[in-house]
Every structure is written in structure tokens, then in C-alpha cells.
Amino acid sequence: MESTPTKQKAIFSASLLLFAERGFDATTMPMIAENAKVGAGTIYRYFKNKESLVNELFQQHVNEFLQCIESGLANERDGYRDGFHHIFEGMVTFTKNHPRALGFIKTHSQGTFLTEESRLAYQKLVEFVCTFFREGQKQGVIRNLPENALIAILFGSFMEVYEMIENDYLSLTDELLTGVEESLWAALSRQS
């Protein structure tokens, strides 16, 4: 018999896949149970309902993503461009570990089903990125565009590249990642 953590992990994995592919409204608890290979009742041992499941999953991935992009900056004193490199590396690491999670975060970030705790976690992520861009603008390094435009350039482009990798239109290589990072930097910086 599977252990409790293994079942819960299977439920999270199945939920992430289905929510990312189908969205919240089109995903049902029986679909999640079938994909996770657990009984439908098993899900309700861990989660009150679909809303509590999606919120826990959302918070988990938002917080982990924030940790990934923050981690390189904590000790970074070599300059703004190096800080950008660490954020990019954090994005790559997170996406390699959770291929569908960024898409899930993006498509569910404005969901009416999100709790206050989920909204605050997402706001903390957005504020971290905005603060990074504001600092770059103060230093004259980052283009004078609205923060949301800068976020769209960074994450939108990155997510599109990773989607092409997932669908085998691109091969994940160090050269590709270096080129993508340099292209994103050129799009965001005044020094391109």
C-alpha cells in the first residue's frame, strides 16, 4: 500500500498537469484521482475541495519559484547584470524541476478561487521582480518601461521558449540557454 506522502505527491503531480493543461474549471476531482491513481475519496482526506487543492498547489509553486529566483541574489554583490543572471538561472532550475508550474502560475494567478493567502504569495513574487527592475531603472541599466511590460518580456519570452522545448521544437542545450539569457538581457537593458 502506498504511503500518505506518496499519495499526496501523486495528487499534486496529477493536479499540476491537469490544471496546467485544462485549467481550473475544466479539471474535475475524478480526473485528478484517475491521473493520480488514487480513489476519489482519497483526495478528500487531504483537501476539503478543489479550491483548497488548487490554492495549496499554487502557494507551493509560487513560494518555491520565488525561492529559486531569490537564492542567487542573496549573496550577489557583483553587479546588476550578475543579479539578472542569477534570476535567469533560478527560472531555469525551477522550470527543469517543475516543467508545467510556470504555466500553471501564470494561468491561475488571477483566479477568483484564490484565497487571500495565495494572492499575497503571488503579490510577494511580483513585488520581488518589480523591485529588481526598479533598482535596475534607478541605476540606468533597465529600460524605462512599466514594470508589467518588463515582467511580460522576461517571463512571457522565457515561458514560450520552454513550451517549445517541451513540445520538441527546440532542444535544451547550454548554448540555447545562454542565447536566451543574452536575448532577454538585450530586450530589457538599455545597453543592448
UniProtKB/Swiss-Prot annotation:
Presence of the UniProt keyword DNA-binding in the record: yes
SUPFAM superfamilies reported for this sequence: Homeodomain-like, Tetracyclin repressor-like, C-terminal domain
Record domain HTH tetR-type: where: 5-65
Residue ranges of the annotated DNA-binding region, renumbered to this chain: 28-47
Keyword DNA-binding in record: yes
UniProt entry keywords in alphabetical sequence: DNA-binding, Repressor, Transcription, Transcription regulation
GO molecular function, one term: DNA-binding transcription factor activity
Entry-linked Gene3D superfamilies: Tetracycline Repressor, domain 2
Pfam families: TetR_C_10, TetR_N
Transmembrane segments: none
PANTHER family the UniProt entry points to: HTH-TYPE TRANSCRIPTIONAL REGULATOR RUTR, HTH-TYPE TRANSCRIPTIONAL REPRESSOR FATR
Biological role: Negatively controls the expression of the cytochrome p450BM-3 gene at the transcriptional level.
Name assigned to this protein: HTH-type transcriptional repressor Bm3R1
The species this protein was found in: Priestia megaterium (Bacillus megaterium)
Top-level taxonomy: Bacteria, Bacillati, Bacillota, Bacilli, Bacillales
